[in-house]
Amino acid sequence: MQKQQGFTLVELAVSLVVIGLVLGMVSLPLMRQLNDRLGRVPGGQDAQDIQAALAMYMQTMGRLPCGSADAGGVENAGLSGRKVQFLPWKTLGLPAGYDKYGSMFGYVVDPGICSVPVQWGSLLDQSPVVNVEFWGAAGKIAGNAVPVAVISYGKNRAGTVDRNGLRFGDAAASAKEKGQAIGQSPAMLYGRVSEAVQEFDDEVLVLPALLLANRASLGGYPVVRQPAASGS
């Protein structure tokens, strides 16, 4: 039997340094821009609230929640993969699941991170099912494969519902917005980081696998790369 390989303390320490560099160069500037645009409204959520709730859930439960089937925000086991679901805001302990426009957040999560033990091998090898491109004034500026993404549908609110579950009209939506509407199964998610992007106004929050692995380890959950299946 092939022995499972875990990360040593040295490897985890090196990973944390890498996380810090990557987040400092890319993720945190994008997060600040996203947080500024989403804003904080009475009862609404900002990007930092959601990021903190997902990280804490990972540390406490050793996994991330599946999506919610409706705006009620309760995790529905099995709702994972490429299909866009509602953010499970109630399961995450958040007071609400909508942005400053009153629109419910979308949520996409890799099934490999929704159960214990987490399938860290594929997640850390940059092969999760959630693929995201970030777009600025000059076009695409970054692309990532990540375990989880949260979508804000912007001012036009195309592709989602309000806090009462009423669907917004999608007539003015671009192809990118229609493709990542709640209920769709997009191969790629698109998030803008500048208002100069006119094609779509959706914004996407992501958490990298290394950051989530660190939180799982802090919670006492082993971060193990499952060995590949051997041939007969």
Segment roles from a protein language model:
Residues 32-34, 58-59:
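Low-complexity Ser/Thr/Gly/Asn-rich repetitive segments
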Residues 109:
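Short, surface-exposed polybasic-aromatic patches that bind anionic ligands, especially phosphate groups
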